UniProtKB/Swiss-Prot annotation:
Topology class, membrane: Multi-pass membrane protein
Name by which UniProt lists this protein: Putative purine permease 19
Domain of life (superkingdom): Eukaryota
Subcellular location: Membrane
Keyword Isomerase: no
MF-aspect GO terms: purine nucleobase transmembrane transporter activity; purine nucleoside transmembrane transporter activity
Residue spans crossing the bilayer: 46-66, 88-108, 128-148, 154-174, 182-202, 220-240, 254-274, 300-320, 325-345, 354-374
Species this chain originates from: Arabidopsis thaliana (Mouse-ear cress)
Family: Belongs to the purine permeases (TC 2.A.7.14) family.
Modified residues (Phosphoserine): 30
Length: 392
């Protein structure tokens, strides 16, 4: 299940040679190619499902643990100066679980490593290095900007929804993304799901509305954070299209990209943590954590792992489908995230049943709409491949 192609759209000349096109009857060759295409398509859909589950699970856990962290450190109290501290720590924790993905990479390569992967990666080292540096800087940028926007701007979640707009703009320019009515419908529904989901819940890190200057700074940080995140997704897709060697396993490429970019982002955030002096606040949080010191450490570890799992799923979806689909899946999970948030922390007392149900339906339909678009595209390519095989 090491998806070695971006999508199940064609059979390569090497694969044709392996099954003996020139030495077998046409009907046997056609049957072999069709069977190969069916297996490839099935594995591709399985990987789509797995990566989507990683995104949803990671987003749910990271949101719940982040709210738990804010409550237990006292950052949910309005007008408390502590509420605006610790942004560099948050951004560093968001990327710090790269040793986990590095272990997965070693495990994968020890089981499925090939010589062609190593030689191809070495030949394009310069381009790969530039790609990982760019992504690492963007990871660090949006992590820090989101951390500031989340704690300084009451409208953060509404600004966050513009992420889908920026992704669609960047992917059109950078990745030459083609749009159809199902993709557009999916974008509209996933945006509606996020909007209704925001209406139906709150959060422990929503700041006070009377902080004028902080509100303005937080809004701008949230805005530029969405730009940086959307740009990072599109650069990932460009990397898979133009930079990552086609001979390299897609699984290996996804994990390697996530590991290297997260490592660079962690180093940048670590420098920011010490330069800003925020490292001095860690001891206070550790000592005053309401549930005790062991749970403080465990909550940060769990939060970091949850964010890494979500990011790994996002990168996988970018590789398998597109940056836009990756963003849509994340947005469609918003209703589920907010429903679980309300159940876990009881942030909203008002009757918001209509908004929760509407958001959940919109999220499901938005995801289904994009999946149907992928299904139609895959079927069209299969038919084209079969007709081409018949003419051979």
């Amino acid at each position: 299940m090491g998806f070695h192609t971006k999508s199940p759209d064609r059979v390569t000349h090497e694969e044709e040679a392996n099954i003996g096109v020139d030495n077998q009857p046409r009907e046997t060759t056609s049957t072999s190619l069709n069977r190969s295409q069916i297996i490839k398509t099935r594995n591709w859909w399985i990987c789509i499902f797995v990566c989507s589950c990683l995104v949803v699970a990671g987003r749910v856990l990271s949101t719940l643990l982040l709210n738990f962290y804010f409550i237990q450190t006292g950052r949910d109290v309005c007008d408390d100066p502590k509420q605006f501290k610790g942004t560099w720590l948050q951004s560093m924790v968001q990327n710090a679980a790269f040793p986990f993905t590095a272990f997965l990479l070693l495990l994968w390569r020890s089981s499925f490593s090939t010589h062609s992967e190593t030689s191809s990666s070495s030949s394009s080292f310069g381009k790969l290095f530039l790609l990982y540096i760019s992504l690492g800087v963007l990871f660090a940028a949006y992590s820090q900007l989101y951390a500031i926007g989340r704690t300084h701007c009451v409208f953060f979640l509404w600004i966050f929804t513009s992420q889908l707009i920026f992704t669609s703009i960047f992917t059109t320019i950078i990745n030459k993304q083609k749009f159809n009515r199902w993709i557009i419908l999916s974008m509209v529904l996933s945006g509606a799901a996020t909007g209704l989901g925001i209406t139906s819940s709150g959060g422990a890190y929503i700041p006070c509305e009377n902080e004028g200057s902080k509100m303005s700074n937080g809004a701008w940080c949230a805005f530029f954070g969405t730009v940086a995140f959307s740009l990072s997704l599109c650069i990932m897709q460009l990397g898979f299209q133009k930079v990552i060697p086609t001979t390299q396993s897609r699984v290996s490429a996804v994990i390697l990209m996530q590991t290297n970019a997260s490592m660079i982002a962690t180093l940048i955030c670590l420098v920011g943590l010490f330069v800003s002096g925020e490292f001095k606040d860690i001891k206070e949080d550790f000592e005053t954590f309401k549930k005790g010191k062991p749970l403080y450490v465990l909550s940060l570890i769990g939060l970091s792992l949850a964010w890494q799992v979500m990011s790994l799923g996002l990168v996988g979806l970018v590789c398998l489908a597109s940056s836009l689909f990756s963003n849509v899946v994340s947005f469609c999970s918003t209703p589920l995230v907010n429903i679980l948030l309300v159940l876990a922390f009881r942030f909203t007392d008002a009757d918001v049943k209509f908004f929760k149900e509407g958001a959940l339906v919109a999220g499901i339909l938005g995801f289904a709409s994009y999946v149907y678009s992928l299904y139609k595209s895959t079927k069209k390519k299969e038919i084209a491949s079969q007709s081409q095989t018949t003419r051979v």
